[in-house]
Every structure is written in C-alpha cells, then in structure tokens.
Amino acid sequence: MIQSHVSVMLNEMLEALSPKAGESYLDCTFGAGGYSKAILESCNCYVTALDRDPNVIKRAEEIQQHYGERFDFVETNFADSFAKLKEKKFDGIVLDLGVSSMQLDIADRGFSFLHDGPLDMRMSGQGLSAEEFVNAAEEKELADVIYKYGDESFSRRIAKRIVEYRKTARIDSTSKLAEIVRSSIGFRKGKIDPATKTFQAIRIYVNDELGELEQFLVNVKNILKKDGRLVVVSFHSLEDRIVKNFFKENSEKPVVRSKYAKDDMTIDPNKWLKIITNKALAPSDKEVGLNIRARSAKLRAAKAIYE
C-alpha cells in the first residue's frame, strides 16, 4: 500500500499540467511521490520521476510496483538529468522546489530545527555539509549567504554570533545552530521561528538549489514537446523570481492586432513559451490551515508553442 503524502497545491498543479491518457510526464522532484502518484491516478499516462536523494528509492519502488511500466524512476538531480533521459521528450514537466516533508521530518537528515540531529542538510548525501560550511566559512561569507538565500535582515548579527560560538565549541547539531540564531535575534512567541530563514539559506546554499534550477531551465526546451506544459511550484522569492523571469524572457507579449492586418508577423523561435498563469497562483487559506508548509508556495505554468 502506497503511503499518503500531503503535496502542496496538488489540485492546482494537475489543472495546470492537464495530464492526458497516453502522454508522458516528467516529475523532476519526486520526494515522497505525491505529484507522481496524482498524475498517474488522473489518467492512463506515463511518469518518469527524478530525485537525487537515495532515501526516496524505496518509495519509488512502491509506486513502481503499483503502476508497473507506467512509472520509471531515475536517481539524479534535475539539472544533470538531460544526459540520463537520453533525448526523451515529455508532454509535461513539473518541479516542486525546496525540501520535502519526508526530509524535514527525519532528524538525521539535519534539515529541520524542530528535530535535533546532525547538521547535514545535503539532499544527496554528497558534497559540502551544513556543518562543514557553518564551522569553516568566514563571517562575511556566512552573513552574505544568510542574507541572500534567507532574506534575513539580521544576517550580520547571526554570522557574528556563529563565529563567536565556534571559538568555544563546534556547531554540529541542528539544535545548536537554532539556539545560536535565536539568541542572536530573540524569540517571539507566536511568530515564525527566528531560525527559519537561516536554515533555509544554508540548505539552499549547500545544495546549490538556485544554480540547479537555472541550469535546468536553460535546457528544458530540449525535453519539452510542442504544446507541452511546464509547471513550477516554488517556496522562496528567489526561486519564484528565477522562474518568473525565465517565463517572461522566453514568451511573446500578447499583441492586439487589427483583423485587417496581414498575417506577416515573424516568428521568433526564442520566444517559445506561452504563459498560462499571468500571476503566480497561491495556495488557498484552507490548504495553508491544513498544511502550514504551504504558506509560501507559488505556482507558475507555461506552455511550449514551438519545439
């Protein structure tokens, strides 16, 4: 039995993607499999799912056992997926950016300040860990990362406190880092935890999340069929800005023309997208009430008008 999972903006994603029987879809961020399962359930279509986190393989195997040849899983990050997909093209592509509930809820992964665990935060388990970064980075670099990726106005104060603390002891757990941040800027009851932005910033940095997103978008045209849809759910203003600008730069502005004008407009192959969502969609108040992690989500979608 496949375990249930609360996926953010699931209905909005399905409406924007508009799956059809016999078509193939790419879920670039498999996570707990919520999007993949919903797409497979919507019609008799096919889904290829990607994820760099080896801990999701068991969940992928469960879905594969249930849906058979209609589902395929590839262990890779989406930015490096193009070579592994072997020039395959899809009728729709969906990205659910950020960290999954499954990663947040496992203390040993080190993503969350709500659970004490080793300060890791690596999605793939490889590369620079959060612990290594926090204990080795210069104060200015710490402040820059926390400000840039967390939009944290107290970034300099937090960075200074981190450097002071590590002179006496290594920062090797999520609880230690969270307390350092809280002691730097104070904790107000009922407000968002002061550690939220710092944890987000460090996670984005060590996993190069924005770099991967940009690299993927540059190449996505090569794997999206004509009339195929690209749906992106983001959770951070920087992610959303990247997606918004990409859609804008690669789409034609609507032109109101006279019915008497000759149809001699030159087609610009670089303007290969048509934006479906004029403004980013946000989750309903009801969804946010049921799943607080949805509060910052934004969904944008576009359709390929040329290959």
UniProtKB/Swiss-Prot annotation:
Q: Record's SUPFAM superfamilies? A: Putative methyltransferase TM0872, insert domain (SSF81799), S-adenosyl-L-methionine-dependent methyltransferases (SSF53335)
GO annotation, cellular component aspect: cytoplasm
Q: Which Gene Ontology BP terms does the record give? A: rRNA base methylation
| InterPro entries hit by this protein | RsmH (IPR002903), SAM-dep_MeTrfase_MraW_recog (IPR023397), SAM-dependent_MTases_sf (IPR029063)
Q: Does the keyword rRNA processing apply?
A: yes
Task: Could you list this entry's UniProt keywords, alphabetically sorted.
Answer: Cytoplasm, Methyltransferase, rRNA processing, S-adenosyl-L-methionine, Transferase
Role noted for this protein: Specifically methylates the N4 position of cytidine in position 1402 (C1402) of 16S rRNA.
Q: What is this protein called?
A: Ribosomal RNA small subunit methyltransferase H
Question: Which source organism does the UniProt entry give?
Answer: Rickettsia conorii (strain ATCC VR-613 / Malish 7)
Name the gene for this chain. Answer: rsmH
